[in-house]
Amino acid sequence: MPWQAFRRFGQKLVRRRTLESGMAETRLARCLSTLDLVALGVGSTLGAGVYVLAGEVAKDKAGPSIVICFLVAALSSVLAGLCYAEFGARVPRSGSAYLYSYVTVGELWAFTTGWNLILSYVIGTASVARAWSSAFDNLIGNHISKTLQGSIALHVPHVLAEYPDFFALGLVLLLTGLLALGASESALVTKVFTGVNLLVLGFVMISGFVKGDVHNWKLTEEDYELAMAELNDTYSLGPLGSGGFVPFGFEGILRGAATCFYAFVGFDCIATTGEEAQNPQRSIPMGIVISLSVCFLAYFAVSSALTLMMPYYQLQPESPLPEAFLYIGWAPARYVVAVGSLCALSTSLLGSMFPMPRVIYAMAEDGLLFRVLARIHTGTRTPIIATVVSGIIAAFMAFLFKLTDLVDLMSIGTLLAYSLVSICVLILRYQPDQETKTGEEVELQEEAITTESEKLTLWGLFFPLNSIPTPLSGQIVYVCSSLLAVLLTALCLVLAQWSVPLLSGDLLWTAVVVLLLLLIIGIIVVIWRQPQSSTPLHFKVPALPLLPLMSIFVNIYLMMQMTAGTWARFGVWMLIGFAIYFGYGIQHSLEEIKSNQPSRKSRAKTVDLDPGTLYVHSV
């Protein structure tokens, strides 16, 4: 029957990952300590942002109030980081948001998440490699770019770069080889570079507070006119705004915070190390929280020092810190800062490249991507094929493409992953424990099963009979979370696209927003009234269900700020991914194979959310 075939097809799209009871066993080498994960998170997050982004945001968007921008951005990133930390404690396996989605919301969403994570890491790797090449070229007087532009220029504007970047190509291939040697070797390099980076940033902070002038946070129009009279190249001056500490108003802080949010992207690479961390359930949450805290303190202190050292409208976006030291008369210090920037970009590059092959490996091992990509090198115990293939693709993009137009595309993939992880945490916290004692396979969220004593009623939505999660209460939360995702998307769309009528008091749009808010609040109350799982974890997100929902709202709102061209490129990337999934992955998925082999199915077990049985390795 056509209906039955359609139903079976739909079940394939939402089937959830089932794992063997010994899921702590891994073919990868468990060699990463908590310090390694903190170094990886700080290195990948505290990269180009602190040396480039701070100058751009302070000059054009926020002025000295950039310190508030970083605070707002850090708070929004912490929301996502807390959700990642809880999932890292629940499911200590490679794959990051991909696996988290697979065990919770189903195969199609998991593939979508993993496919976009691959896009984010590839673009991030290529763009940082280009930035490293440019920073090194600037340090030696731009000889590389001048030579290549004069001899091998590319004449395809808005598509390709001005010239092929052989330096970036070689850099990515070199680091690909380093990652292929093993995680512990690359972790050592990351720790060294991150240490140098933090020392340089410490020097910048101390210098800024010693040589800084509080008057630069109180600039007036007279100061601006004086600067124009003193400078010959007044075209390099940024806008004054209204002067003072918040020269561009509250709107400038929000615009700056939206940009600064991307300076914290990168901590999620810690969540991909579940099969290589020595104690993943403890070290992954600690690594995420500590790395985000360190990065916020560094961003806050450096941006404060930078805006105290020189007027915000005179900052150079491309190289704000070296120019600031020139401004205060410490010219030799710019070389110290240059070394720090190269170390920061190096760790950021490793941070982008490290999770890329591991997400590919996790998807290939599950059969959603080509199985050859899951091959493990017997000597180094690293995903050698996935590492080499992803490195070559990233090197090719760094070699030919100018990636400034693709940054927003990278952000969509990252924000989508953050949102799905938050939804997964919300759903899992309200599910009953699913340890399978009879050997029968049980999905993480099963269909609503009611008994004579448990029926779905309006009273039961707000006053459930049980104090522990049941299949019915778990299904209620699953459905309510799906409805909330739709309603929050609609609310963010209205706020982003029709903000002017709302601010002007348009009754229609005001009524729409009020209605959406009432529905959202009502569903949140229903979720809040359901019993939560009491499974002990090393880390749990506080204030459920509010914190995950706040994270989802912020992420979706930022996605709504993307341009139509960015969404069009996103659509092309997703078409390629769906062609692979429906042409190969849906038929070769491990879950598909299990469903066709009853003998194996009888022995399969789902994810055991009890850490005592889930993870047996001890340090």
Curated annotation (Swiss-Prot):
Q: Does the keyword Phosphoprotein apply?
A: yes
Identify a single GO molecular function assigned to this protein: amino acid transmembrane transporter activity
Cytoplasmic side, ranges: 1-36, 83-107, 184-191, 255-285, 357-382, 428-475, 528-540, 591-619
Q: What GO biological process terms are annotated to this protein in UniProt?
A: amino acid transport; L-arginine import across plasma membrane; L-lysine import across plasma membrane; L-ornithine import across plasma membrane; transport across blood-brain barrier
Extracellular membrane side: 58-61, 129-162, 213-233, 307-335, 404-406, 497-506, 562-569
Membrane-spanning residues: 37-57, 62-82, 108-128, 163-183, 192-212, 234-254, 286-306, 336-356, 383-403, 407-427, 476-496, 507-527, 541-561, 570-590
**Record has Transport as a keyword:** yes
Q: How is it modified after translation?
A: N-glycosylated.
Q: Which reaction does it catalyse?
A: L-arginine(in) = L-arginine(out); L-lysine(in) = L-lysine(out); L-ornithine(in) = L-ornithine(out)
Topology of this chain in the membrane: Multi-pass membrane protein
Task: Spell out the GO cellular component terms annotated for this protein, sorted alphabetically and separated by semicolons.
Answer: plasma membrane
Q: What coarse category fits the chief subcellular location reported for this protein?
A: membrane
Localization (cell): Cell membrane
Residues where Phosphoserine is found: 618
Glycosylated positions are 232
User: Which residues get modified to Phosphothreonine?
Assistant: 606
Tissues expressed in: Highly expressed in thymus, uterus and testis. Detected at lower levels in brain, mammary gland, prostate, salivary gland and fetal spleen. In brain, highest expression in thalamus, hippocampus and amygdala.
Q: Which UniProt keywords apply?
A: Amino-acid transport, Cell membrane, Glycoprotein, Membrane, Phosphoprotein, Transmembrane, Transmembrane helix, Transport
The record's listing under PANTHER family reads:
CATIONIC AMINO ACID TRANSPORTER 3, INNER MEMBRANE TRANSPORTER YGJI-RELATED
Protein family per UniProt: Belongs to the amino acid-polyamine-organocation (APC) superfamily. Cationic amino acid transporter (CAT) (TC 2.A.3.3) family.
What the protein does comes down to:
Uniporter that mediates the uptake of cationic L-amino acids such as L-arginine, L-lysine and L-ornithine. The transport is sodium ions- and pH-independent, moderately trans-stimulated and is mediated by passive diffusion.
Note the NCBIfam families from the entry: 2A0303
Give the protein name, as stated in the record: Cationic amino acid transporter 3
Q: Identify the gene encoding this protein.
A: SLC7A3
